[in-house]
């Protein structure tokens, strides 16, 4: 979707530039061809103003092919590339839009808004290293702009900047710039996962002072638990015992987010964050009351008087929290009813794929495989799911077919999970346990623990959390997991890279 206000401002600025440029060309008595390039550009600008994107890009690309384009001043060329990016974005040619934004930001006229457009267009085509470069530029040159920028885009760029394993230095440069720019998430929450990685980089460079400085911003008990469990962080954990007191951290985070929610009465996003903190703390009855109050307010509000600004993006997670609280209280049937309602809530403006998969997952926990498969009906496999999401969907199908004793379909799905195991290694690990392949599951868990890039999640999985009510099939799955973790080879690897602790918090599954 094009940002209409920014587009209109760009088009108005281009109109002023065009008028001045034409007058200058006439005064200079240049050849008619000089005026022609301006006329072609203006044709493209007017088409863009009328939302005729194909017509606009045709005119702009015609101008770009004209020899006279190269004689234009750099500021004029900058505006033409910017118009081209808007036109391609309007016709959903995101690769073209990204290429034009890369050209536009090569000019000194480019400001923070233009670099943010480059990051947005890069994210559309999964060019995450370039998105990271754009955000780094903003954070360094316009740090004040970071506070008002799209925090979800910035977070995604920061987390995915080194997905190919070739841009570690550039990612650390980005994290350093974001830390200096005081980047925060909605409601002032810290991006704990980013600071976790920045602390690790400081320790790898034997800079304990810097590690302590960055660790001081980490708020979430879950991130602190992962760091306590990882031997790479021992120096900073020892130096900052107060920060890494998990019992205190759980209470501290609940208190902080309660105040944040009060200070942001129209934000569901901060209430979703608060909900996660309440789950960690085991305050399930409070979370249930909170979610019921929110759902009631939304349900009874008039269409033109929505009580929150982000209902479309966040309400489905409020339903998810309510269901999680009910399960944690052992109210299984009530939780299923809530999850069925959650499936009907839109997710980011489209079909709620996440809740459909979650519903299917819990149906197989309940021993209702037919319902699980039915919950997955209607999901657009090709367009609605990421590679990770497809693994979750297939795992639900695998468990359902196992319960139905449909060996052929179960084997077919297991073959898919095996072939695509790198898309979600944690899910493949669970599938191997379900299949009785403890040796394979152990080998994978050991490999994940020894891999510095995968250790965070693997160590988090092996911690001992406070007990929760479990259905029979959940208890069976937990028994298989404990058998895996108790193996001598797995236990030795855990001790080699970290430790297994009894965490004073809950790990409530979505």
What function would you assign to each model-found segment?
Residues 358-365, 377-415:
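Alpha-helical adaptor scaffolds
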Residues 8-17:
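Bacterial N-terminal signal peptides
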Residues 23-28:
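Boundary at the C-terminal end of the N-terminal hydrophobic targeting segment
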Residues 33-42, 73-81, 108-117, 145-158, ...:
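Generic helix N-cap/helix-start motif at coil->alpha-helix transitions
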Residues 49-62, 89-99, 124-137, 162-178, ...:
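Helix-turn-helix repeat elements of alpha-solenoid scaffolds
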Residues 29-31, 65-72, 102-110, 137-146, ...:
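Solenoid-like repeat scaffolds
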Residues 202, 425-510:
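Long, ordered, amphipathic alpha-helical scaffolds
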């Amino acid at each position: 979707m094009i940002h209409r206000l920014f587009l209109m401002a760009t088009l108005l600025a281009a109109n002023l530039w065009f008028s001045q440029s034409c007058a200058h060309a006439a005064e200079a008595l240049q050849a008619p061809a000089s005026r022609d390039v301006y006329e072609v550009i203006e044709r493209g600008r007017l088409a863009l103003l009328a939302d005729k994107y194909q017509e606009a890009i045709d005119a702009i690309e015609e101008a770009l092919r004209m020899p006279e384009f190269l004689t234009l001043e750099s500021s004029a060329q900058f505006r033409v590339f910017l118009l081209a990016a808007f036109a391609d974005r309007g016709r959903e040619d995101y690769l073209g839009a990204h290429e034009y934004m890369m050209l536009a930001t090569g000019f000194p006229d480019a400001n923070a808004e233009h670099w943010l457009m480059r990051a947005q267009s890069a994210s559309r085509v999964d060019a995450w290293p370039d998105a990271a470069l754009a955000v780094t530029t903003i954070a360094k040159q316009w740090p004040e702009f970071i506070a008002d920028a799209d925090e979800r885009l910035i977070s995604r760029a920061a987390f995915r900047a080194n997905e190919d394993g070739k841009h570690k230095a550039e990612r650390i440069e980005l994290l350093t710039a974001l830390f200096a720019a005081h980047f925060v998430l909605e409601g002032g929450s810290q991006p704990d996962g980013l600071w976790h990685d920045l602390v690790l980089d400081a320790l790898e460079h034997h800079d304990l002072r810097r590690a302590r400085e960055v660790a001081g911003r980490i708020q979430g008990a879950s991130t602190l638990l992962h760091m306590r469990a990882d031997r790479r962080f021992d120096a900073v954990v020892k130096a900052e015992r107060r920060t890494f007191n998990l019992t205190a951290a759980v209470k501290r985070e609940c208190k902080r987010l309660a105040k944040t929610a009060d200070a942001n009465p129209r934000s569901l996003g901060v209430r979703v964050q608060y909900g996660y903190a309440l789950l960690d703390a085991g305050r399930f009855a409070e979370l249930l009351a909170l979610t019921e109050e929110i759902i009631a307010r939304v349900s009874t509000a008039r269409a033109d008087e929505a009580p929150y600004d982000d209902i479309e993006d966040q309400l489905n997670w409020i339903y998810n929290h309510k269901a999680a609280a009910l399960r944690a209280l052992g109210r299984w049937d009530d939780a299923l009813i809530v999850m069925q309602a959650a499936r009907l809530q839109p997710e980011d403006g489209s079909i709620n794929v996440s809740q459909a998969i979650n519903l299917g997952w819990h149906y197989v926990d309940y021993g209702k495989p037919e319902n699980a498969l039915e919950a997955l009906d209607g999901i657009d496999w090709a367009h609605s799911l990421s590679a990770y999401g497809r693994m979750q969907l297939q795992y639900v199908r695998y468990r359902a077919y196992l319960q139905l004793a449909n060996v052929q379909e179960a084997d077919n799905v297991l073959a898919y999970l095996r072939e695509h195991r790198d898309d979600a290694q944690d899910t493949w690990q669970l599938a191997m346990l379900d299949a009785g392949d403890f040796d394979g599951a152990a080998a994978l868990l050991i490999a994940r623990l020894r891999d510095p890039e995968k250790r965070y999640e693997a160590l988090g999985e092996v911690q001992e959390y406070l007990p929760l009510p479990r259905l029979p099939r959940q208890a069976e799955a937990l028994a298989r997991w404990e058998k895996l973790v108790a193996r001598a080879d797995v236990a030795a690897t855990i001790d080699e890279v970290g430790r297994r602790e009894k965490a004073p918090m809950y790990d409530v599954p979505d």
